[in-house]
Each structure stands twice: as structure tokens, then as C-alpha cells.
Amino acid sequence: MKGKFIVFEGIDGSGKTTQINQLSKWLISSDLIPENNKLVITREPGGTKLGKSIRSLLLDTSIEKSPDSITELLLYAADRSQHINEIIRPTLDQGDWVISDRFCGSTLAYQGYGRKLDINLIKDLEAIATQGIAPDITFLLDIPIEESIRRRRNRKDDRIEKEGREFLSNVSLGFQALSEDSNWKKISAIDSKEKIISEIKSEIKKLIKNK
């Protein structure tokens, strides 16, 4: 049986890392994952050795000249293609589960809505990179822009996080639009951590029940 593919999306500061950690602990201790299978936690960009090098090119603020928007898009696609072939597809084919911090939704939100690149161009490129692999469920952890800024106040931002308020607003609007898809579940990330993980667990149980 093919494994489950779970993705977390959201603007920076939405609490994806916290909720991924909470969910992984719960799944490992539950009986939802078949006994002989495992759970793999990964991220984009940077889920593979090659991807880590691409991540550095994309996000490092010390690089003198940042990649232009199209170069940036192609680098994300290259990272995703390698990620699919090296990690995600082999893991799912073994019946194991995958949780990824970001996937295609981030590219559509950041490069499409944020950078204003052509959405259809991005979708065509994503089709090549993903080769038919799609999440079983995507959680959008939704927070207001002001809350994102407040939460990131004391941490060092990467190159994308340093973009201005207007860019972040456009990205947030992109995520809102994407979350209308039936495989997406939007969850308020300003609620308590306990309430958030409770909602996530409930959706995972529904996913298993309806498989």
C-alpha cells in the first residue's frame, strides 16, 4: 500500500515546524502508520544533499547578487525534482509516510502571487518536477501578516523573509486562494498549540477513514 504524503504550508512564522514536530510524535505513537512502515520528515528547499546547496543559493543573504525571479523559480523546481526522485517517491512506494515542510503551494504563493510570475508557467514547470506526485492533504497554517512579523522579530531572516510587507501580503493572498482546493485544510495558527494540533489530528483521522 502506498504511504501518505502530508504537507504544511504558510507564511514564515506560522508555526509549521512546531506542528510538524507535534504531529510526528503523535503519528509515531499511534497505530495509524502500518507496523512495518516509518515516517519521514523533510522540507523544501533542502530535503536532499543537492537541495541543501540549492537552498543556500536561494536563501543566503550573503550572496552579493540575488537570483532573478525566473532563475529563482527554476532553482525551486530543480530542488523539487531531486526531492521527488530521491526522497518522496521512493518513501511513498515503500508504504512509508512523508511529512514535508513546504511543497508546490509555496512556489505558487511566493513566485506566482509574490513575484507575479505567470501562474500557468509555474504549474507547467511543477508538472514536470513532481511527475504526478501530489500531497494527500496540505495544511495551511494561517496567520495575519502582523503576527508573522511579530513572531520573526528576534530571529535572523533569510533572503525571502527580508522581502517587504507588500510582498508578504501578496504571498498570504496566494495561500488563501490555494486553500480553496479540497485537499487543503486551512487552520488558524493564532489559536493555542493544543487546539491547532487537535484540528490536525482530526483531519488525519478523516484522511485515513476515507482512504
UniProtKB/Swiss-Prot annotation:
Enzyme class: transferase
GO terms for MF: ATP binding; dTMP kinase activity
EC number: 2.7.4.9
Signal peptide start-end: none
Reactions this protein catalyses: dTMP + ATP = dTDP + ADP
Residues binding ATP: 10-17
Cellular-component GO terms for this entry: cytosol
GO BP of this protein: dTDP biosynthetic process; dTTP biosynthetic process; dUDP biosynthetic process
Protein name as it appears in the record: Thymidylate kinase
Organism: Prochlorococcus marinus (strain NATL2A)
